[in-house]
């Protein structure tokens, strides 16, 4: 557990140093009730050590691990909170930009599909579409494209715009 705490602290420090954030923000809890409790635990573990050596080893290690767990969790949460606060302080609109871009991209794709399929297919009669498909049947690649992308797109790609 101590090694996990040390690895977490080292990871936070390395990330902050790599981002050139040399001023580390350390936030201490001003909760006075939390501070006397660890002192009482340490005195209990020292009194236990005088009565029994094996009991003191286990209680001291337990109190040490709980102290280090609480300090590491508070420091890691404060560093993550400060990192997110700094990110929001730098550019608050940056968090919403990707969503808007994605919506615009989706809308433009749907609009292009509607424009490509709608008027082109509706402008031709059934006889005209049939004559385009007869011309495309002669070319295997055009016929395959007609099956996947549509006859008008395939004819336009291989032979140019339809003559009618």
Swiss-Prot record:
What family does the Swiss-Prot or TrEMBL record give for this protein? Answer: Belongs to the osteocalcin/matrix Gla protein family.
| Keywords noted in UniProt | Biomineralization, Calcium, Disulfide bond, Gamma-carboxyglutamic acid, Metal-binding, Secreted, Signal
Q: Which PROSITE patterns match?
A: GLA_2 (PS50998)
Q: What is this protein called?
A: Osteocalcin 2b
Q: List the disulfide bonds.
A: 136-142
For this UniProt entry, what's an example GO CC term? extracellular region
Q: Which residues carry this modification: 4-carboxyglutamate?
A: 130, 134, 137
- List the biased-composition ranges (Low complexity): 30-95
- Organism of derivation: Oncorhynchus mykiss
């Amino acid at each position: 557990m101590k090694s996990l705490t040390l690895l977490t602290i080292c990871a936070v420090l390395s990330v902050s140093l790599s981002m050139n954030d040399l001023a580390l923000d350390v936030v201490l809890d001003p909760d006075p009730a939390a501070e006397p409790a660890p002192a009482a635990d340490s005195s209990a573990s020292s009194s236990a050590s005088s009565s029994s050596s094996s009991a003191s080893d286990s209680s001291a290690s337990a109190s040490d691990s709980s102290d280090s767990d609480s300090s590491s969790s508070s420091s890691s949460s404060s560093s993550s909170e400060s990192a997110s606060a700094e990110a929001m302080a730098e550019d608050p609109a940056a968090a919403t930009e990707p969503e808007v871009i994605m919506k615009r991209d989706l809308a433009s794709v749907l609009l292009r599909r509607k424009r490509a399929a709608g008027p082109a297919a509706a402008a031709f009669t059934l006889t005209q579409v049939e004559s385009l498909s007869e011309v495309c049947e002669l070319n295997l690649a055009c016929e395959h494209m007609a099956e996947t992308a549509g006859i008008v797109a395939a004819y336009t790609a291989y032979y140019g715009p339809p003559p009618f």
